[in-house]
Amino acid sequence: MGRAEAGTPKAISNALKSKGLQRLRWYCSACQKQMRDENGFKCHTQSEGHIRQMNVIAMNPGKRIQDFSNQFLRDFISLLRTAHGEKKIHFNQFYQEYIRDKNHVHMNATRWHTLSEFCKFLGRQGMCRVEENEKGFFISYIDKNPANILRNEANKKRERQEKSDEEQRLRLLDEQIKRAYESAQNNEDNKDGSSREQPVLHEIDLSKKGNPIQLNLSSSSDSHSAQNEFFQTRNTPTFSFSSSSSQTSLKHKPKNVFAELNKSRKKNNKDSLDQGQNVKRPRSAVEDIIAQETMREKRRNIKL
């Protein structure tokens, strides 16, 4: 039976049937041809083309198997590098991605019989990082290209430099915040100190008799000198003796300044109390209403 011509309904139907992956047991690796059922595979193995191809492979089977193995390994690593890079992925999941290609090299044509054996081979050769856990094998590609290695090292160095610069900026920012906080605290302390009342000393002039008492309000800078002069003047009274009389007369007797100050304060307090009593407190609205009601009651009583 001849083969259907291209574009005919029979050819289109066969193409739709052969689209996608088929059973691996019905795939001929020697001829690289996929059959759709067991009968088709049996007919293919009895065909003249298949027998001729098997005779060619039988001349040097090891070389043919090695070629298939190298091609399988090359395609597998290329897809891993381009699709996932150096990311870690489950080995069986990635193998399913690899066999999606209809024209891929099947593993039954290579020297590896199982996926576990092939995964261990990749780890021993240093082509991939292989990790095994309770979920199975995980692989990740190892990039050995010198240019890529230099680029990765430069990227890591730049990341470390950026990290150190960021840490330095954060440290400087913390120091600035600390200095600003300390300066603010010092300013508040200075304001509190300046707002406090300074102690005032009363400097009394008792040098001349008969003159009114003079009080000088000095600042805290002259406190010690003014205080010493005051007590020296108070504690050392001066006396004069008359030659004509036998009695000693007191020429200069210091006055009790504090007693006079107390008297003046009492007098001022008394005057302020008298003035406060004389000033009438304004009445409230309730008091006005009560007064009006009282006046009305008085008028009613008078009329009666």
From Swiss-Prot:
A zinc finger (C2H2-type) spans 26-50. Keywords: Metal-binding, Nucleus, Zinc, Zinc-finger. It is found in: Nucleus, Nucleolus. GO terms for biological process: DNA damage response; DNA replication. Disulfide bonds: none annotated. Residues 204-228, 261-291 are annotated as: Disordered. InterPro entries: C2H2-Znf_KIN17, DNA/RNA-bd_Kin17_WH-like_dom, KIN17-like, KIN17_WH-like_sf, Znf_C2H2_sf, Znf_C2H2_type. One of its GO terms (molecular function) is zinc ion binding. GO terms for cellular component: cytoplasm; nucleolus; nucleus. Its main location: nucleus. The keyword Ribosomal protein does not apply. Belongs to the KIN17 family. This is KIN17-like protein. It comes from Schizosaccharomyces pombe (strain 972 / ATCC 24843) (Fission yeast).
